[in-house]
Amino acid sequence: MMNRFTIAFVALVGSIAMLSCCGKDEKSDSPDPDSLAVQTDRKPFHTSDPLTGRTPSTTVSSDKMALYFFGWGEDKDYIFHLDFPEKRHDRVIIAYTMTSVLEGPASYDNTTMLFVRNKADGQWYEIARAFTPFGNAFTSSWSKTFWIDVTEYAGMLTGDTEFRLYYGGFDATAARSHAVKLDFKLYEGKSSEEVVWTAKVYDSSRDGNSGYRAWSYGVEGYDIEDDTRLGRRTFTLPADVKSVLMKVSISGHGHDQGKFTERYDYETNNAAEFDENTYTVIINDVAQKNTGRIFYSNRNNYQQAGTYFYDRANWAPGNPLNVQYWTITPPQDTRQLSIDLNLEKFESQFTDPKTEGCAQYIVEVDLFGYR
């Protein structure tokens, strides 16, 4: 039989245990400072319709647009407009069709970037990036469609909407040219999440120093980690933003045989197109546990001419970009969010960032705040 002292002692221990458990639960709601950013397993694109069986309420389509070199600056990009319904949609999927004009696609694997103007802030956001195939062996009947989920841009896709198209190749001829056709599939419904805030973190297409909308990598005096490039950026989050999606679009280009200074006994493999890299995400001056990898296996790429089966830095000939998505938990004690991305250290073999073959990265990083 328990006496009063024993009963009191048991009650005290139970109370302490309950308080301890409560403390743990409370603490678990707030991630550690080095775990605020976590990469998700969201697919960058699909090779078949991810919403098969569900009918879009509206499809907004572009004409088939031939791809040729429009010019060096953003003001030379191909401009077009599409008219969307005025209401917001639950899901938005682009059916991105690679095709051709005249006798078939052009020869090479070049960068294509699609930008949309956000009416709210007037800025251009890269909604999709893709790479043309080695098209020599394809005829005029060839085409290939990919499906890209762009639901986070739904708020920008209302009414008369302006787009810019960039193509980084010079391979169009009088007989052959790559082309692209876009079908925006809009699905009605009430989303459980709503984007209430957007911001740009990095955009190399605005001030690329390589000549190709990219930032050179490892060239002395043109550090990609400079404040004007991949430097620290600070944002004030609106009070109603509960979570943040970070979209990281990085593709490597060039065939530079420089040196990764922190890799022991390593032989560079034509950076930055054919050599992999990693990046560290720094949130509010704290390096995150998860690191990003700039690499894409082309082992299962479909057959083309050329080096379509060689692994590359986040991309494959004839495919959309290997975009990476991160969720960021805003710090609990402040509405200030700073972001910094650090690549591995590299010393280029070149001294001029515009030298053909110089290692370079095309970079766009955007934030989407959810209520």
Outline where the language-model segments fall.
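Bacterial N-terminal signal peptides that target proteins for export
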Residues: M1-F9
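Short, intrinsically disordered low-complexity segments
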Residues: N3, G23-E26
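Core hydrophobic alpha-helical transmembrane segments of single-pass membrane proteins
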Residues: A11-G14
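C-terminal motif of bacterial Sec signal peptides marking the signal peptidase cleavage site
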Residues: A17-C21
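Extracellular/secretory-pathway and virion-surface proteins
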Residues: E26-R371
